[in-house]
Amino acid sequence: MAAVLEVEIGGEAVREAAGEEMDLSELAPEERWRVEHARMHAKHRGHEAMHAEMVLILIATLVVAQLLLVQWKQRHQRSYNMVTLFQMWIVPVYFTVKLHWWRFLGIWIVFSIITAYITYKATRKPLLQTTPRLVYKWFLLLYKMSYATGIVGYIAVMFTLFGLNLLFRIKPEDAMDFGISLLFYGLYYGVLGRDFAELCADYMASTIGFYSASGMPTKHLSDSVCAVCGQQIFVDVNEEGIIENTYRLSCNHVFHEFCIRGWCIVGKKQTCPYCKEKVDLKRMFSNPWERPHVMYGQLLDWLRYLVAWQPVIIGLVQGINYCLGLE
C-alpha cells in the first residue's frame, strides 16, 4: 500500500510517495524534523492495539525491575552499590559517543583521571596520613561545584520558562539547552562523586582502624584524635579555627570539620565513624543555609536510579518488543 506524506515547507506542499526518497540534508533542521515526524506517523498508523501491548509490557517490566532491584539492594547491598556505580560511570559515555557530545566526554575523562588517582591513593596500604584529607577535600570540592552548577542550570531553565531570556536577546531554545546542560552536569557528577566518596570513605576508615562496617572498632580512640583521618585535633570545639573548626557530635566524639562533613554529607554517612550512633545533622549544622544540601543529596539518590538503571530497563523492553515483533 502506497503511503503519501504531505508536509508544508516554505508555503509549498512536498509530497513523498512510499518508494521515493527525499534528500533531507538540504532542508533546515525544523523542516527536517517535520518530515521525519510525518514519516513516523505514517509508519505507525493503525497500530493502536500494538502500541497498547507495548505500554503494558513497559509498565510490567518497570514494576518487576523495581521489585528485583529493591530485593537485590536489601540482600546484597555491596554488590548492588558496586554495579550501580559502574553503570553510573559507563552508561552515559555510550550515549555521549553516539550523539557526539565531545564536551561532556572531555569533562568525563578529566573527572575519571582525577577520581581514579584519588581512589588509588585511598586504597593503598599503609594509608598515608595526608590521604584522608586529600580525598575528602576533593569530593567536597566536587560536591560544591556540582551543587552550584545544578542551581545555575535550574535558574536558567526557570528564567527561560518565564521569558526572562528575551531581556538579554537570547533565543529560548539556546537558553533552555544551556540550562538543561548545566542541570545535567550538576546532577550527574553530584551522584557519581557521592558514590565514589562513599567507596573511599569506607575503605579509608576501615584501613585506619577506628571504623568497621560490621564489627567493633579495632583501635582505641583518643579524645584528641580524629576518628576519620587519624590525625591530632589542635582546635577546641568552642574555639574558632583559622583553616577549619572542630565539631562535636551528639555522642560527644570530636572530629575535624572537613573530615566529618565529608563523612556525613559527601559519603552519605549518617552515623558516628567510631560508635555508629545516629548523627543529628540539624544540631551539627548551625547555619540555616547549610541544611538544604542535605536534601539535595537525597534528590541525587533518586536520580541514581534514572541514570544507572532506567537505560537498562528501556533496553530490556525494546528487546522484548523486538522478540514479539512489536514496533
Swiss-Prot record:
<feature type="zinc finger region" description="RING-type; atypical">
    <location>
        <begin position="226"/>
        <end position="276"/>
    </location>
</feature>
<dbReference type="GO" id="GO:0005789">
    <property type="term" value="C:endoplasmic reticulum membrane"/>
</dbReference>
<keyword id="KW-1133">Transmembrane helix</keyword>
<dbReference type="GO" id="GO:0061630">
    <property type="term" value="F:ubiquitin protein ligase activity"/>
</dbReference>
<dbReference type="GO" id="GO:0036503">
    <property type="term" value="P:ERAD pathway"/>
</dbReference>
<dbReference type="InterPro" id="IPR040176">
    <property type="entry name" value="RNF121/RNF175"/>
</dbReference>
<feature type="transmembrane region" description="Helical">
    <location>
        <begin position="148"/>
        <end position="168"/>
    </location>
</feature>
<dbReference type="InterPro" id="IPR001841">
    <property type="entry name" value="Znf_RING"/>
</dbReference>
<feature type="transmembrane region" description="Helical">
    <location>
        <begin position="173"/>
        <end position="193"/>
    </location>
</feature>
<keyword id="KW-0256">Endoplasmic reticulum</keyword>
<comment type="function">
    <text>E3 ubiquitin ligase which accepts ubiquitin and transfers it to substrates thereby promoting their degradation by the endoplasmic reticulum-associated degradation (ERAD) pathway which is a pathway involved in ubiquitin-dependent degradation of misfolded endoplasmic reticulum proteins. May regulate the unfolded protein response to reduce endoplasmic reticulum stress.</text>
</comment>
<feature type="transmembrane region" description="Helical">
    <location>
        <begin position="99"/>
        <end position="119"/>
    </location>
</feature>
<comment type="similarity">
    <text>Belongs to the RNF121 family.</text>
</comment>
<comment type="pathway">
    <text>Protein modification; protein ubiquitination.</text>
</comment>
<keyword id="KW-0472">Membrane</keyword>
<keyword id="KW-0808">Transferase</keyword>
<keyword id="KW-0863">Zinc-finger</keyword>
<keyword id="KW-0862">Zinc</keyword>
<dbReference type="GO" id="GO:0008270">
    <property type="term" value="F:zinc ion binding"/>
</dbReference>
<dbReference type="InterPro" id="IPR013083">
    <property type="entry name" value="Znf_RING/FYVE/PHD"/>
</dbReference>
<dbReference type="GO" id="GO:0000139">
    <property type="term" value="C:Golgi membrane"/>
</dbReference>
<keyword id="KW-0479">Metal-binding</keyword>
<feature type="transmembrane region" description="Helical">
    <location>
        <begin position="79"/>
        <end position="96"/>
    </location>
</feature>
<feature type="transmembrane region" description="Helical">
    <location>
        <begin position="50"/>
        <end position="70"/>
    </location>
</feature>
<keyword id="KW-0812">Transmembrane</keyword>
<protein>
    <recommendedName>
        <fullName>E3 ubiquitin ligase Rnf121</fullName>
        <ecNumber>2.3.2.27</ecNumber>
    </recommendedName>
</protein>
<dbReference type="GO" id="GO:0016567">
    <property type="term" value="P:protein ubiquitination"/>
</dbReference>
